[in-house]
UniProtKB/Swiss-Prot annotation:
Organism, scientific name: Mycoplasmopsis pulmonis (strain UAB CTIP)
Induction comment: By stress conditions e.g. heat shock.
Statement: the UniProt record of this protein carries the keyword ATP-binding: yes
Record SUPFAM superfamilies: Actin-like ATPase domain, Heat shock protein 70kD (HSP70), C-terminal subdomain, Heat shock protein 70kD (HSP70), peptide-binding domain
Annotated keywords: ATP-binding, Chaperone, Nucleotide-binding, Phosphoprotein, Stress response
Pfam families membership: HSP70
Taxonomy, superkingdom: Bacteria
The name this protein goes by in its record: Chaperone protein DnaK
Family under the similarity heading: Belongs to the heat shock protein 70 family.
InterPro entries, A to Z: ATPase_NBD, Chaperone_DnaK, Heat_shock_70_CS, HSP70_C_sf, HSP70_peptide-bd_sf, Hsp_70_fam
Modified residues (Phosphothreonine): T187
Length: 599
């Protein structure tokens, strides 16, 4: 295993995945349920924070359940649950804490460092928000890397000697990216990236939900949109139908007792054909065409120059998506990678590079959007064009717009529009103390620096007086350092409380499982057990039940150890008795061996 384990995390809209480097090879870790993907869902129940599959199952019944929080990262929007208001970073931190916890259990040690992936088209605020979420979860986020880049890293790790150009088409649950990379001698250079931060598998689900709502209205004279719980069931059914239609031509949608009206219960039984589904979602598939064309154009290559086309993200399993990609690029996509896991694996590889476990790999990523400042007339003047390789620093000299101007305001913008007001303002600051002079005379140097995580720092310097001012562009949700520290502290406190609750639940579940096993054994094998052993087992079952009822967890742990040993002996005895009965009618070798042990 690595000298220093750095987690590779794909923090997805729908699902999240964790990977590490083990013996110089990436390994995807299983969660507490033995699954390799974890739903990015958080639920609050009885004062406990629940994450993953257990939370997803509550989407239908628990209003304090939050999904698809990634869509709100980097915004000022909040969500309400559990009687409180949460920022997106806090909810994402709960997901990251859960991933960190099960990773620590798997490797048997505390883990504090991570590489986290984000959509290539995430802006500065969204990247900063992701780092803050990691910090709240107790993680030092060493790198933020783009999801398509991570996928290419994973695909190309064993092809370092080859020279190839790869297009990565990444359609996740809530975001869409296309990146073109060049792989040569272990260097992974991103040539271009394009995409849509508001397009993903959720949108395909939404189309089916709209269809279901309309069909139910027409066929059953019932409007499901007026019932939140019913709509949650429709969303779950829509996701299942979408998945089914990736493998079969018809999806059967059955929703028994969807609701009850004056006419009686509503039992929905509908059929959705793949051809109908494809017709309904043509506009969504078509929205992914232009980013493909843009990425190729900006990389200055033709589709015929591509060595490989990689499909990443669970939504790329949709047949219409695969057909469109093949049609537009004239090349069959490579299906050798797992679209759900490849991004986390790439993040782990980058972690392995940082830890020194993987050598001869260099990642050169790009900034997805143009960065610049607002100049006279509200014009957005670019300093760093989109698809510039990072890390990078660029400078340009500007001047004053009025005579004797003693102060200038630097407004930093991100986007491709010519006017500053049409782009996203990332922040602003003032440079004061400029010596009086006619307009156009003072020389003010503005420098932009983008680090390996895509985080931007802007400096302004008066070249005559050497006075300077700088700003590191922070998350647009404007979380102060104090707020972040408070969240870190709260998360740590909750982590201990949640851990205690979780351990308590695990002990109770273990005890209830044992009770069930013992009671079943008494029913199945009771007539073959002597009265004393049977009475002792019944007594132990009652003791377990009493300890659970009285909430005596520590005593329950001790009693469990004792009874589990007794249960094992009971099971062996039952097996021996059963074998003895069988031996009366059989001369098999196996029976003779059991008889020998019994004597």
């Amino acid at each position: 295993m690595a000298k220093e384990i750095i987690l590779g995390i794909d923090l997805g809209t729908t699902n999240s995945v964790v990977s590490i480097i083990e013996n110089k090879k990436p390994v995807v870790l299983e969660n507490f349920n033995g699954k390799r993907t974890t739903p990015s869902v958080v639920a609050f129940k009885n004062g406990e924070i629940q994450v993953g599959e257990i939370a997803k199952r509550q989407l239908e019944t628990n209003p304090d359940t939050i999904a698809s929080i990634k869509r709100l990262m980097g915004t000022t929007k909040t969500v309400k649950a559990n009687g409180k208001t949460y920022k997106p970073e806090e909810i994402s931190a709960m997901i990251l804490s859960h991933l960190k916890e099960y990773a620590e259990k798997k490797v048997g040690k505390k883990l504090t460092k991570a590489v986290i992936t984000v959509p290539a088209y995430f802006d500065n605020s969204q990247r900063e928000a992701t780092k803050i979420a990691g910090k709240i979860a107790g993680l030092d986020v060493l790198r933020i890397i783009n999801e398509p880049t991570a996928a290419a890293l994973s695909f190309g790790l064993d092809k370092k000697e080859k020279e190839m150009k790869v297009l990565v088409y990444d359609l996740g649950g809530g975001t869409f990216d296309v990146s073109v990379l060049e792989l040569e001698n272990g260097t992974f250079e991103v040539l271009s990236t394009s995409g849509d931060n508001h397009l993903g598998g959720d949108d395909w689900d939404h189309v089916i939900v709209e269809w279901l709502t309309k069909e139910i209205k027409n066929r059953y004279d019932f409007d499901p949109s007026k019932d939140k719980m019913v709509m949650t069931r429709l969303k779950e059914a829509a996701e299942k139908a979408k998945i089914d239609l990736s493998a079969q031509m018809v999806a059967q949608i059955t929703l028994p007792f969807l609701s009850v009206t004056s006419k009686g219960p509503i039992n929905v039984d509908l059929e959705l054909k793949r051809s109908e589904f494809e017709k309904m979602t043509t506009h969504l598939v078509d929205r992914t065409r232009k980013p493909i064309e843009d990425a190729l154009r900006e990389a200055k290559i033709k589709a015929s120059d591509l060595s490989e086309v990689l499909l990443v993200g669970g939504s790329t399993r949709i047949p219409a998506v695969q057909s469109m990609v093949e049609h537009v690029l004239g090349k069959k996509p490579n299906r050798s990678i797992n679209p759900d896991e490849v991004v986390a694996i790439g993040a782990a590889i980058q972690g392995g590079v940082l830890a020194g476990d993987i050598n001869d790999v260099l990642l050169l990523d790009v900034t997805p959007l143009t960065l610049g400042i607002e100049t006279l007339g509200g014009v957005a003047t670019p300093l760093i064009p989109r698809n510039t390789t990072i890390p990078v620093t660029k400078s340009q000299v500007f001047s004053t717009a009025a005579d004797n101007q003693s102060e200038v305001t630097i407004s930093v913008v991100q986007g491709e529009r010519p006017m500053a007001s049409d782009n996203k303002q990332l922040g602003q600051f003032n440079l004061s103390g400029i010596e009086p002079a006619p307009r156009g005379v003072p020389q003010i140097e503005v420098s932009f620096s983008i680090d390996v995580n895509g985080i931007t720092t802007v400096k302004a310097k008066d070249l005559k007086t050497n006075k300077e001012q700088e700003i590191t562009i922070k998350n647009s949700s404007k979380l102060s350092d104090e707020e972040v520290e408070k969240m870190v502290k709260e998360a740590e406190e909750n982590r201990e409380a949640d851990k205690a609750k979780k351990e308590k639940v695990e002990v109770i579940v273990r005890a209830e499982s044992l009770i069930s096993q013992l009671e079943k054994s008494l029913v199945d094998q009771g007539d073959k057990v002597d009265a004393k052993a049977k009475e002792e087992t019944q007594k132990q079952i009652q003791e377990l039940k009493d300890l659970i009822k009285d909430d005596k967890i520590e005593e329950l742990k001790v009693k469990l150890e004792q009874i589990e040993q007794a249960a094992q002996a009971f099971a062996q005895y039952s097996a021996q008795q059963a074998a003895t009965e069988n031996s009366k009618d059989s001369d098999t070798v196996e029976a003779e061996i059991v008889d020998d042990k019994a004597n």
